[in-house]
């Protein structure tokens, strides 16, 4: 929604510039985790005469105690959670990419296995666990669920989201992947793989974690083309593999629970049981001497931006 801040404001919905880091309100999330919302923060939110929209792809990682803290501190506002429900088989690939963007180093298979080993306890695989928690904290009527896969199939995600927050859709609204000037577009899996490798290098050698690598990679992409980025991309592209995801047992289990327990708050439900193909980079590229050389050159360039 960052691209649409002025258009939202015209209809009375504030998307604050406060707490913005990269593409969302990540600083607000961190303040919630640290129990560090100041009197000024609370006053800004509590005393606003307009509705306020906060968004961060990482709010989902907060636990019940975190949300209870937010509810108790922001005591002059009715907090409504808008949750985009994606079937686990499709979602895990996207969530893994977000983990990498924020400093993760796990391969997709490693990340997926940690959840798949205990599917009934994973809030990533069993969406009902997270949703029940939201209703417990904020109330049953303060949850709106958007069927992401339904919206995606109709190319209506932004429209459906705006409907959920009572905003009238206009063609002037920015849709990220259709606009060359939009922020927070999805990244090619090849670049995700390069960032994953860089995350490991900078965490081990420079104690640099979080989204710093992704931020610098995006900012310096043009310059990195002169340091072997194109050549490294080509090496990784040559070793991509395709796997099918979706229509898993855990998807069927979650689907049944969702349509029985949350039918009244799902905005645009449509059954989803198709199988999709995703691409993954094999880690074998790291054994390629040429790839190692290009990665070292890219690392050297990014190292120049480390604080002294």
Regions found by a protein language model. Name each.
Residues 1-308:
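Anion-recognition interface
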């Amino acid at each position: 929604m960052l691209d649409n801040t002025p258009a939202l404001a015209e209809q009375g919905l504030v998307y604050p510039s406060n707490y913005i880091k990269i593409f969302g309100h990540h600083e607000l999330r961190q303040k919630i985790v640290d129990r560090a919302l100041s009197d000024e923060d609370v006053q800004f939110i509590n005393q606003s005469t307009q509705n306020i929209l906060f968004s961060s792809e990482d709010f989902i990682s907060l636990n019940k105690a975190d949300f209870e803290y937010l509810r108790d501190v922001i005591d002059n506002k009715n907090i409504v959670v808008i949750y985009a429900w994606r079937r686990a088989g499709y979602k895990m690939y996207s969530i893994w990419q977000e983990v990498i963007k924020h400093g993760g180093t796990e391969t997709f298979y490693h990340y997926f296995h940690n959840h798949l080993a205990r599917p009934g306890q994973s809030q990533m695989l069993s969406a009902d666990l997270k949703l029940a928690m939201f209703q417990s904290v904020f109330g049953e009527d303060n949850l709106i669920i958007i069927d992401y896969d339904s919206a995606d199939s109709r190319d209506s995600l932004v429209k459906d989201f705006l409907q959920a927050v009572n905003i009238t859709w206009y063609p002037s609204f920015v849709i990220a992947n259709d606009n060359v000037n939009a922020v927070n577009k999805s990244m090619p899996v090849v670049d995700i793989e390069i960032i994953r490798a860089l995350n490991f290098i900078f965490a081990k050698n420079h104690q640099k974690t979080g989204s710093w690598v992704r931020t610098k990679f995006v900012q310096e992409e043009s310059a990195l083309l002169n340091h072997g980025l194109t050549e490294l991309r080509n090496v990784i592209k040559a070793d991509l593999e395709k796997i099918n995801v979706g229509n898993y047992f855990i998807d069927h289990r979650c689907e049944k629970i969702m349509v029985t327990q949350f039918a009244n708050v799902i905005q645009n439900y449509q059954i989803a049981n198709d199988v999709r193909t995703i691409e993954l980079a094999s880690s074998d590229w790291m054994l390629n001497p040429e790839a190692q050389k290009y990665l070292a050159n890219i690392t050297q360039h990014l190292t120049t931006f480390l604080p002294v």
